[in-house]
C-alpha cells in the first residue's frame, strides 16, 4: 500500500510538471507589451495617488501601443533595474526617460529618438557653487543610480574631489537635498524645472550654472537587440506621430517649447 501510494504520488508529480511546462496559459500574451518604468520622474513618469502611472513618456508609449495594435502593461521598478529586467525578459521594453548612450548601446537597442533635454545642477538658492571640478571639490552631489547623471559626475567631477551620492529613486535625491545632506543634485533640466522646482518642496531651490552636455543621443525606448521587428514597428509609429502632429499635441500637454530637439 505504501509502495502504491509513493508511485501514485510520483505519477501525479510528473504529470503536474509536464502540464506546467506545456500549458499555453502560462505563455506571455503576444498582444501585451510589458514596459518597464520608474515612475518617480515628473513630468515624464509619475505614479498618481490611485496607483496608475502617467506622464509624457506614458502618453507617448500608450499612443505607440495603439498604433502597433498592442496593449501597454506598465511594470514599475527602480531605474537601475530596468536593463537587467529587459535582458531577463521580465519586460519587453523600457520607457523611463532613458538616455541613448554609447555604453547602453553596447547592452541593448533603442528606438529612434523620443525627445532630447539638457541636464543641469540644482541647489538651494544662493549656494556659492561653481559648476566645475574645482568648484565642486568636497561637495556632495546627488544623482539617481544607473543614470547618465551618475556617470557624468563620476567622470567629470569625482576625480576633482566631488563626492557622488547615488540613490535608488529620484525622490531620495530630493529628500536629502531638502534635508541638507546634499550640496546639489544633477538631473534633466526639464524634469527639474517642470517637476521638483514647481512643487512646494522645491521652493528655495534653483539652477546652478548653465545646461550641461551629457554626450547622449537623446532619449529612446530601450529594447533587446534581437527584437528587430518590434523596434521597426515602434520606429514607424514614432515617425508617423511626428508626421501627423500627434507627437506635438501630446508634448503640448506638458511643455511650451520643442522637446524633440534638433
Q: PLM features: what roles do these ranges have?
A:
Residues 27-97, 106, 244, 253, ...:
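Extracytoplasmic small-molecule ligand-binding "clamshell" domains
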Residues 33-37, 133-147:
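Short loop->beta-strand "edge-of-pocket" segments that line small-molecule binding or catalytic clefts
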Residues 27, 123-141:
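Flexible hinge/capping segments at coil-to-helix
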Residues 39, 115-123, 197-236, 255-262:
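Periplasmic-binding protein-like
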Residues 47, 61-70, 133, 149-168, ...:
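Ligand-binding cleft/hinge of the Venus flytrap
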Residues 71, 148-165, 204-206, 236-262:
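Ligand-binding clefts/hinges and TM-proximal coupling segments of bilobed small-molecule sensing domains
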Residues 81-84, 96-106, 154-156, 183-215:
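A ligand-binding cleft/hinge motif common to bilobed small-molecule-binding domains
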Amino acid at each position: 500500500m505504501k509502495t502504491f501510494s509513493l508511485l501514485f504520488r510520483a505519477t501525479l508529480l510528473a504529470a503536474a510538471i509536464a502540464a506546467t511546462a506545456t500549458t499555453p496559459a502560462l505563455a506571455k500574451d503576444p498582444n501585451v507589451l510589458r514596459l518597464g518604468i520608474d515612475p518617480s520622474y515628473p513630468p515624464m513618469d509619475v505614479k498618481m495617488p490611485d496607483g496608475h502611472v502617467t506622464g509624457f513618456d506614458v502618453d507617448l508609449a500608450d499612443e505607440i501601443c495603439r498604433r502597433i495594435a498592442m496593449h501597454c502593461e506598465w511594470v514599475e521598478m527602480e531605474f537601475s533595474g530596468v536593463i537587467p529586467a529587459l535582458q531577463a525578459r521580465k519586460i519587453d521594453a523600457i520607457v523611463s526617460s532613458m538616455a541613448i548612450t554609447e555604453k547602453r548601446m553596447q547592452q541593448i537597442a533603442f528606438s529612434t529618438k523620443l525627445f532630447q533635454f539638457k541636464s543641469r545642477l540644482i541647489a538651494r538658492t544662493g549656494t556659492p557653487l561653481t559648476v566645475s571640478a574645482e568648484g565642486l571639490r568636497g561637495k556632495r552631489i546627488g544623482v539617481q543610480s544607473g543614470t547618465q547623471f551618475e556617470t557624468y559626475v563620476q567622470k567629470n567631477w569625482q576625480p576633482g574631489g566631488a563626492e557622488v551620492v547615488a540613490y535608488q529613486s529620484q525622490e531620495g535625491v530630493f529628500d536629502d537635498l531638502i534635508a541638507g545632506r546634499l550640496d546639489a543634485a544633477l538631473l534633466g533640466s526639464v524634469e527639474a524645472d517642470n517637476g521638483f522646482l514647481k512643487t512646494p518642496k522645491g521652493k528655495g531651490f534653483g539652477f546652478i550654472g548653465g545646461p550641461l552636455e551629457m554626450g547622449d543621443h537623446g532619449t529612446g525606448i530601450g529594447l533587446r537587440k534581437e527584437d528587430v521587428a518590434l523596434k521597426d514597428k515602434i520606429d514607424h509609429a514614432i515617425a508617423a506621430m511626428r508626421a501627423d502632429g500627434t507627437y506635438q499635441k501630446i508634448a503640448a500637454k506638458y511643455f511650451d517649447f520643442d522637446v524633440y530637439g534638433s
